[in-house]
Curated annotation (Swiss-Prot):
Alpha-conotoxins act on postsynaptic membranes, they bind to the nicotinic acetylcholine receptors (nAChR) and thus inhibit them. CnIA and CnIB block muscular nAChR alpha-1/gamma and alpha-1/delta subunits. Residues 22-47 form a propeptide. The cysteine framework is I (CC-C-C). Alpha3/5 pattern. The modification Cysteine amide is found at C62. PROSITE patterns: ALPHA_CONOTOXIN. Keywords: Acetylcholine receptor inhibiting toxin, Amidation, Disulfide bond, Hydroxylation, Ion channel impairing toxin, Neurotoxin, Postsynaptic neurotoxin, Secreted, Signal, Toxin. Expressed by the venom duct. GO terms for molecular function: acetylcholine receptor inhibitor activity; ion channel regulator activity; toxin activity. This is Alpha-conotoxin CnIA. Residues 1-21 form the signal peptide. The keyword Membrane does not apply. It is found in: Secreted. The keyword Secreted applies.
Amino acid sequence: MGMRMMFTVFLLVVLTTTVVSFPSDSASDGRDDEAKDERSDIYESKRNGRCCHPACGKYYSCGR
C-alpha cells in the first residue's frame, strides 16, 4: 500500500469514528438525569443531618 492510500484509510477511520460517536451522546441524556437525581439525594440527606454516601459520610452519621 502506498502512503497516499494509507493516509486515505486513516482519514476514513477517523471520520467514521467521529460520525458514529455523535448519536451516542444523545442517548446519555436519560443517564444524566439519573445521576442528577442521585446527587440531589445526597444533598437532601446532608440537609437532614445524615448521609450514607462516602463523600459526605465522614461529616454526617449514616443513620442506620
